Amino acid sequence: MKKNDVFASYAVVPPQAARNPEFYQKRNLPIPTLSVVSENDKGVVISGMKMLATSAIFANEIWIGNLIPLAPDQVKQSITCAIPCNSNGLSLWMRQPLSKHYDNQFDAPLSWNQDETDVLVTKMKH
């Protein structure tokens, strides 16, 4: 990283609504948490969402991992890897930074007093 002057962010938390896979399984819906969907000669193909990628909009790559313990049946979600921010199918959804335009601190508690650059990372398989 130092040699190539790479700035990396991390995405280590599934979206809160996706932390209960049973909800999606009962409705026959795909679980939105980032998962391995296939493997090929080039490596693994991933798809889904991860959160808390602070400053990812400024990063060269994002380190994917898991901060919250996973259940034994969540093998596909247990990937740890780094992905370049210019990867095909990668989208970064960020909170609005420095929300001084709100009328009060209650409407934007995190970004009222400081810059807030946490990002939701979505990766569509390609």
Give the positions of each predicted feature.
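FAD-binding core of flavoproteins
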Residues: 10, 15-126
